[in-house]
Amino acid sequence: MFKIMPQHFLGGLVLLTSVWLTGCASLPSDVQRPVSTALADNSGTRLGAAVSARAAAATTRNDSAFALVGSAELAFTSRMTLIKAAEKTLDLQYYAIHADDTTERMFEALREAAARGVRVRILLDDFNTAGKDAQVLQLAFEKNIEMRLFNPLPSSRASGLWRIVSSLSDAARLQRRMHNKIFVADNAVAITGGRNLGDTYFGQSEGVNFVDIDVLAAGRIARDLSRSFDGYWNNPLAYPVQSLISARDIEALKPKPVAAASTSPEKSAPLAPEPTRAQADANTPNKTTVTRVAVNPAGLTTTIAALPDTTDLRLLSWTWAASTMLVDKPSKIADDADAAEESNNTTVDGLLSLMARAKTDLLVVSPYFVPGPEMMKQFADLRKSGVRVRVLTNSLASNDAVAAHAGYVRYREGLIAMGVEMYEMRSEQRGTVSSFGSGAGLGAGSGGGSSGASRASLHAKAVVVDNRLLVVGSMNLDLRSKLQNSEVAIAIRNRKLASEATALIEPGLTTGAYRVELVNGQLIWRAPAGSGLPDATSEPDASLGLKLLVKVISPFAPDEML
């Protein structure tokens, strides 16, 4: 039994009282939400006209085109390119937008777009809008920029931890989050996938950088994503920022500057001017680019100042293909009967249905992997049918959500026993920070130990079925994505794209991950061939404290909460 020492009693009482008072707080009831929708006719925009021209020239009846985005740099520059190219509308829907260097460059580009008359709508889940990241909300007070927060918490934004503690009285609201990730320009070209917005998603964090996958989408599928955005934007759970917080209150939350002992030259360098845009070359062959860059002294893939602002999207390998959007309705997050009725009609359910069609090979990438009994049965059925199943997920050391790993370990031995090939991503990628890229892998180190200048964490969510069907989206294979969060994904039926995705992912299995095997009842982590690393009999690169924490959490944490 815990005891409260006398000297801490008053502080504890104040804390509990504050939490209770915050729990009694409520959201505004009289909120004005002007209805708005995506651009109805984009034929008068350069992006719309370009997509139409490409569609007319394509020798296919498919109405959507796609290009995979594996590298962190391309993920940044493609978004910047769309911002700068937009003439009418920009719609952004994200779970998290961090206030840092890469997003400040995006914000400046968004302000410039708004100044030239582009309508900018930003829909952001409210969970991560505390502390430093609350400064993102300042965009809501710019002309031509509208920002709404989805499923907001009526609690302080002083810090993320305090938001969680002070929202425990409404745990159901706290758990249900909008996890969708959509970026659409002029209702013509879109980006969706696993990435949120921030340094850690664009290879610019001095700590951990996420390895992720997005897909650029043009044509009809972009319009589908826009319709999904509109459904969330005009939903009663979307609150205009101005109805929740004032510009003055946001300014008051700004972190006080701290004098640094030393300043990295990379971080202090002025932003590089926008490079001259490459001219399109009709004879340029379609190739999947290889992205592998050396780490600088700060541990970054490239200096922020050196990141280009744009890329020529015309030079990417675009493929016209049959596709469909998988998306949860906003009512999934609402606490009502409709949501309960739709609990078996989710993005994850659609994904599982597609996975069940596998005949020969299933490749799964899921950073947070807590399958639960239903998914375990599906994996067992696939293995009984002779389907090869490979799963890439995070190791304990690379996982930024220890609780999720605690849920995963309950199923790991069972998966391996049924013949699923399990790979866990290495946290330390010696000497390099790598993105998914054809032939690049996930940091194939040059021997020695697994200690290096950079740390990586898997964040990509993708599935390849029989090398003919590719699914990329925001969902994880866990019960949180199935039951708690709203998600979005694109399923693309095309052998070329599925093969490209496989070529992006497979080097990560062989060079950037441990193969986990079960030998005589003992788990063995097989180090990548040629890495110079030893095999391990316990979670590699993880501290003893972290391993003990997982053992404590694992038997008790419910799957649907992880």
Where in this protein do the model-derived segments appear?
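Bacterial N-terminal signal peptides
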Residues: 11-22
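Charged, low-complexity intrinsically disordered terminal segments
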Residues: 2, 6, 21-181, 185-562
